């Protein structure tokens, strides 16, 4: 019995370590080349990059906020780019038919960009400076945090 409990605790710890968000990119460091034309096109601008998947409930909740964020801060120099990592484009298209995006969508069906950043949680987002430096990384989406997140983005942009 004690041995089973010990094995359970070891398995739980291993699971928690694996599930914890670990980013290959950190605030203040350059964003690596993600191999996405939609991100490359935004060089020289502030970019809010969001990684999402069609099966992710919090991702669905974040889209109206990102639409509003693009509308509000786009004229001040922010470009929102949401990177879909679904293996099937049809899954992303179905999601977008119910939850439209008024910002740029990039498709990465192999998930290579998320792998480069060691992203483990959906959604995960980051703000990147015009110089290509990651300003911060944010994991998950909670509606009650949107005002703080928007304030953080605005402050980083000097607005």
Residue ranges and their predicted role:
Residues 20-24:
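Sec/Tat signal peptide C-region and signal peptidase I cleavage site
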Residues 96-131:
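Short, internal strand/loop/helix patches
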Residues 45-47, 51-55, 121:
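Short pre-active-site segment immediately N-terminal to redox-active cysteine/selenocysteine motifs
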Residues 51-68:
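Conserved redox-active cysteine motifs that mediate thiol-disulfide chemistry
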Residues 127-159:
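Thiol-/selenol-based redox modules, centered on thioredoxin-like
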Residues 10-19:
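Bacterial N-terminal signal peptides
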Residues 77-90, 101-110:
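Thiol-based oxidoreductase modules, predominantly thioredoxin-like and allied folds used
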Residues 27-47:
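A short beta-strand-turn-helix
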């Amino acid at each position: 019995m004690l041995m089973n409990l010990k094995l359970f605790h070891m398995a739980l710890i291993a699971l928690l370590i694996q599930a914890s968000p670990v980013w290959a990119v950190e605030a203040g460091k350059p964003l690596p080349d993600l191999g996405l034309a939609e991100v490359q096109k935004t060089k020289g601008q502030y970019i809010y990059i969001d990684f999402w998947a069609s099966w992710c409930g919090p991702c669905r909740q974040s889209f109206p906020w990102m639409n509003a964020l693009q509308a509000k801060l786009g004229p001040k120099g922010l470009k929102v780019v949401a990177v879909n990592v679904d293996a099937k484009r049809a899954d992303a298209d179905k999601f977008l038919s119910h939850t439209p995006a008024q910002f740029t969508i990039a498709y990465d069906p192999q998930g290579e960009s998320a792998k480069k950043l060691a992203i483990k949680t959906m959604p995960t987002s980051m703000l990147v400076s015009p110089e290509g430096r990651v300003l911060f990384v944010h994991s998950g989406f909670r509606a009650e945090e949107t005002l703080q997140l928007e304030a953080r983005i605005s402050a980083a942009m000097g607005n």
